[in-house]
Amino acid sequence: MTAQLIDGNALSRQLRTEVAARTAALKSRGITPGLAVVLVGDNPASQVYVRNKVKACEDVGFHSVLEKYDASMSEEQLLARVQALNNDPSIHGILVQLPLPKHIDDHKVIEAISPLKDVDGFHVASAGALMVGQVGFKACTPYGCMKMLESIGMKDLRGKHAVVIGRSNIVGKPMAMMLLAANATVTVCHSGTADLAAMTRQADVVVAAVGKRNVLTADMVKPGAVVIDVGMNRNDEGKLCGDVDFEGVKQVAGYITPVPGGVGPMTITMLLVNTLEAAERL
């Protein structure tokens, strides 16, 4: 058995077409969704991510603002810029690209963003809303993973066991909460888990999100399981790869996401969805 691919590029194109149509409808009422992206420093990976986000905005008809600052920018200066963007009525979403320089407190900056413009879904208000099932912005990567599950008919996960590998605030924790909201029975595994394979072999859905190559191999996967690979790593040849041993696991799984072309494009797409919804809520 060879797993079916869940094509993140194809699903992203479909969703972005819907976003563009809803954006056009908003524009006819005089509202153009606006996203401000703030980049501090010259991290090469961050520069690529930021360019991709700005281009995606332009492609669906958003107004986008890219603010680039030198790595020497002070925390106080950055907080002042965030406050100015909070007060700008043409901006509906604010994204501060992480990581920030070491002298700036990531948490303090994220909490300075208005919850009404927290389209990354990282603010404690967004995390709290997710926890208690209220309306709020969902973290983009796990939100994209849920859309991928939905695309293969797995919107309701009642009776399914989902295992999340990783407990970060950006992916692991919100992923677990979204799976729980979809009625899955959820297990969260991490560096303190005694027997990871014993957990994953029981899983109908596995989400790997630790940033470590080959954390999930074929012998750890239940036949027919759905495997979502959030990882972004480089192999020995320097090529992009995920957390999953793709070649091995695809022989066992029922569905699998590739890297690249899986979760990555969905993350940016859900950022667009969140920004659009921020504008629609006005």
Curated annotation (Swiss-Prot):
NADP(+) binds at G166, R167, S168, S191. It catalyses: (6R)-5,10-methylene-5,6,7,8-tetrahydrofolate + NADP(+) = (6R)-5,10-methenyltetrahydrofolate + NADPH; (6R)-5,10-methenyltetrahydrofolate + H2O = (6R)-10-formyltetrahydrofolate + H(+). One of its GO terms (biological process) is purine nucleotide biosynthetic process. GO terms for molecular function: methenyltetrahydrofolate cyclohydrolase activity; methylenetetrahydrofolate dehydrogenase (NADP+) activity. The keyword Ribosomal protein does not apply. The keyword Iron-sulfur does not apply. One of its GO terms (cellular component) is cytosol. It comes from the Bacteria. Its EC number is 1.5.1.5, 3.5.4.9. Keywords: Amino-acid biosynthesis, Histidine biosynthesis, Hydrolase, Methionine biosynthesis, Multifunctional enzyme, NADP, One-carbon metabolism, Oxidoreductase, Purine biosynthesis. Pathway: One-carbon metabolism; tetrahydrofolate interconversion. Catalyzes the oxidation of 5,10-methylenetetrahydrofolate to 5,10-methenyltetrahydrofolate and then the hydrolysis of 5,10-methenyltetrahydrofolate to 10-formyltetrahydrofolate. PANTHER family: C-1-TETRAHYDROFOLATE SYNTHASE, CYTOPLASMIC, C-1-TETRAHYDROFOLATE SYNTHASE, CYTOPLASMIC-RELATED. Belongs to the tetrahydrofolate dehydrogenase/cyclohydrolase family. Homodimer. This is Bifunctional protein FolD.
